[in-house]
Design a protein with these regions (language model features):
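Short acidic/glycine-rich loops and adjacent helix/strand connectors
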Residues: 1-184
Length: 184
């Protein structure tokens, strides 16, 4: 999404352009679309935000694997190099995806703050209660708060391993659907 003076002027998902469901590649087409809609260039951007805090999420992953060790050792050894490569080099990937034209710092918001913002800010409400639920972000699995004008405040969180979203995913898997895809 692209905001100008606190107002959403454009938003798009990369999968709409590439026709690949849950496209995990850099959203280059979506970025270009949003910039064109606003009539600006990457160099004109004041901030670029990313939807989670990778190092906070790494803390949860590491703590979870260590608490269940040595049971999860094989999956840890397999998953961590891939995950670390993706997340530790994220600023470099963002720079590359933006053609090295953005010269300022990136902002990393917490996962549930991103969900809450994507629900509240495009809504027609000036003021509203906000609730997010999913499997897990960094540590939070649910968050509660309120939005008013251009301000969003999350006041309470439920933390991993307590998660209605993961329970939902377990039932999704049990009934034969693909987790994080077949639910909707």
């Amino acid at each position: 999404a692209l905001l100008v003076d606190g107002k959403i002027v454009a938003a798009a998902q990369e999968e709409r352009f590439t026709r690949k469901k849950h496209d995990a590649d850099f959203p280059g087409h979506a970025v270009e679309f949003c910039l064109q809609q606003a009539g600006i260039r990457v160099e004109d951007l004041d901030h670029v935000a990313f939807y989670d805090k990778p190092l906070l999420k790494f803390e949860r992953l590491l703590e979870t694997y260590l608490s269940y060790g040595p049971v999860g050792y094989k999956s840890f050894v397999k998953a961590m190099p891939i995950w670390l490569k993706q997340k530790l080099y994220l600023p470099r990937e963002l720079n590359q995806g933006l053609g090295h034209r953005y010269k300022k710092r990136y902002i990393f918001t917490e996962h549930h703050e991103s969900h809450a913002a994507s629900a509240f800010f495009p809504s027609p409400f000036e003021e509203a209660a906000v609730m997010t639920l999913d499997g897990v972000g960094e540590w939070a699995t649910a968050s509660f708060g309120y939005g008013k004008g251009n301000d969003l405040t999350l006041t309470h969180e439920l933390h991993f391993p307590h998660s209605l979203g993961l329970l939902y995913s377990a039932f999704t898997y049990f009934t034969g659907f693909k987790v994080n895809s077949g639910e909707y």
